[in-house]
Amino acid sequence: MRVLITGVTGFVGSHLAEHCLELGHEVAGTFRWRSRDENLSVVKGKVALHDADLRDPVGVRTVIQAFQPERIFHLAAQSYVHASWASPAETLSTNIISQVNLLEAVREAGLTECRIQVAGSSEEYGMVFPDETPIKETNPLRPLSPYAVSKVAQDLMGYQYHESYGMFIVRTRSFNHEGPRRGEVFVTSNFAKQIAEIEKGLKEPVIHVGNLEAFRDYTDVRDIIRAYILSLEKCESGEVYNIGSGNAWQIGDMLSTLLDYSNVSVEVRQDPARMRPSDVPRLECDASKFKKATGWEPEIPFETTLKDTLDYWRERV
């Protein structure tokens, strides 16, 4: 099967590419010219790479017409919530216009059998009240960041293209996913990198943190990619599905667990620059709809994910 992964050089895209190759699929991926490709070191030469800025409709059409994908996992995005506050227009442009161009290219190419996964986010739910957790797909969307607004737009656009043109599109709302290769701007990976640097004497024994009070539902990326593949095989077109573990961790407890895997003594210091103008206090997933449709269950304990992430940074700092 011909599988196209947008954002293939990224954290999730690289893991997904490896797994698709293991399943025997022909894999292609899009990337932007300034993207770093070290995440693809294991599969270099096995994935057809297309240098394409998805905001350019001509470039997107060229890729779609050349590869004729049967499955598309649309992962490319400006995915850092904090950066969306500094660059709201770029975040909205990157995430919304890119998807318009992708869906239009598939439609214009007449690929009626192509199945598309739109990777949404739990951030779409935004302000969730205590009596609304665990969060179901029917919960109101109250986005609290420009990033979240962009993902709501992508989500609804996927629904609209399914309804308007009969395209096979499954929308997923993934809760936090972590593991090796996670970008250092994201909190779990950032803490792990700081600890690895302290262990090697590369920085003072101070962990700089933002909001440690928030709760997040964490799943290992290696479980998430299995879920994404199942979403296009088992789920209903036009529907939306939550994907997550159903276990909410307080960020402070996540940091404590990482520190338990190290023998360094550190000071934890709050950095005002790491605080968001508004933050989602608790995100906890109800993935029962997705599990019923696919039979998926997360297999990797979060403690293992944290240990693997710390070991990843120990090898790189």
Q: Over which residues does each language-model region extend?
A:
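Generic structural signal for alpha-helix termini and adjacent loop/cap motifs
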Residues: 15, 87, 105, 109, ...
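Amphipathic terminal alpha-helices
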Residues: 2, 25, 302-317
